[in-house]
């Protein structure tokens, strides 16, 4: 097969592992920087050009689109979909999962467990907003944040009010969540491919750090999931419409709580923590599904 990987840097661990896994199975692979693509969208024959050449005859596309380039990256992916190329994750599913408010509303509607969460833009009563989620301590997040950036633990009501007011001064949309103390600064990343959890790791925050992101100095280790955790992770990925997803859970006294569903989960942490060939499993999934062109929206979303 001819497989394209939408990525801005082929030396990144995840991208290089996907190249390695695909080539070892005899596939032709090309890394495509979505920002350098340009498209003809007003033609009966939709086209994508990259470095002066038309991109043709691709069987599948693997989107590794960074959060900062979601708008244009998903536009390019949508164009591939319109050309009949099989997307590992569809453009509409990626945009759905990248919108934190929309994704949490969808998960809530389907009864998925989550921390009590408040959303706000310019709350005229910060005290009432905090009361809504049970009061301090609370976790306050910028809606556009990634990798633990823009996430603050406010341990007192006064601190929480100050952080909310500071974020309001930035004209930023915010999310206020209850703090799950029993999680102990750890979360679980479940890696879902094709409706199955194929690997899972526990991420523990550095000492004195409540954020468990590996980018913030956290550590990762193999973890055994409960049946409920496995079921929750698969359901969350399915609700987003993602074939490949990283579902982040917290262990709480009331069961697993979903924090986020990531449409472009990194491979380095999960492969090193579990010893599994996750990149190879993604290519295996493409081999089984690309020929059938099983895509729900066909680029209409």
Curated annotation (Swiss-Prot):
Its EC number is 6.3.2.-. Its cofactor is Mg(2+); Mn(2+). Mg(2+) 2 binds at residues 260, 262. Mn(2+) 1 binds at residues 248, 260. ATP binds at residues 141, 178-179, 187, 211-213. Mn(2+) 2 binds at residues 260, 262. Binds 2 magnesium or manganese ions per subunit. Mg(2+) 1 binds at residues 248, 260. GO terms for cellular component: cytoplasm. It comes from the Bacteria. Keywords: ATP-binding, Ligase, Magnesium, Manganese, Metal-binding, Nucleotide-binding, Protein biosynthesis. GO terms for biological process: protein modification process; SOS response; translation. PANTHER family: RIBOSOMAL PROTEIN BS6--L-GLUTAMATE LIGASE (PTHR21621:SF7), RIBOSOMAL PROTEIN S6 MODIFICATION PROTEIN (PTHR21621). Belongs to the RimK family. This is Probable alpha-L-glutamate ligase. It comes from Aliivibrio fischeri (strain MJ11). The gene is rimK.
């Amino acid at each position: 097969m001819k497989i394209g990987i939408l990525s801005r840097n082929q030396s990144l661990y995840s991208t290089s592992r996907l190249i390695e896994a695909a080539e070892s199975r005899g596939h032709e692979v090309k890394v495509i920087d979505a920002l350098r693509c340009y498209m003809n969208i007003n033609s009966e024959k939709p086209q994508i050009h990259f470095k002066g050449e038309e991109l043709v005859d691709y069987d599948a596309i693997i989107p590794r689109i960074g959060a900062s380039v979601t708008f244009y990256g998903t536009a390019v992916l949508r164009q591939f979909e319109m050309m009949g190329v099989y997307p590992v994750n569809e453009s509409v599913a990626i945009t759905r999962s990248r919108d934190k408010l929309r994704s949490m509303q969808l998960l809530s509607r389907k009864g998925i467990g989550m921390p009590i969460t408040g959303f706000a833009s310019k709350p005229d009563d910060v005290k009432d907003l905090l009361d809504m989620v049970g009061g301090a301590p609370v976790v306050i997040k910028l809606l556009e944040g990634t990798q633990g950036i823009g996430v603050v633990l406010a341990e007192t009501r006064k601190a929480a009010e100050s952080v909310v007011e500071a974020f309001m001064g930035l004209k930023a949309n915010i999310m206020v969540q209850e703090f799950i103390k029993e999680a102990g600064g750890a979360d679980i990343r479940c890696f879902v491919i094709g409706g199955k959890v194929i690997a899972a790791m526990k991420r523990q925050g550095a000492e004195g750090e409540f954020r468990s992101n590996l980018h913030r100095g956290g550590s990762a280790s193999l973890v055994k999931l409960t049946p409920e955790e496995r079921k929750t992770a698969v359901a969350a990925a399915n609700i987003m419409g993602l074939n490949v997803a990283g579902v982040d859970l917290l262990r709480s006294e009331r069961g697993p709580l979903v924090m986020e569903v990531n449409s472009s989960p990194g491979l380095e942490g999960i492969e090193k923590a579990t010893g599994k060939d996750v990149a190879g499993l993604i290519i295996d999934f493409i081999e089984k599904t690309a020929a059938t062109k099983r895509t729900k929206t066909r680029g209409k979303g």
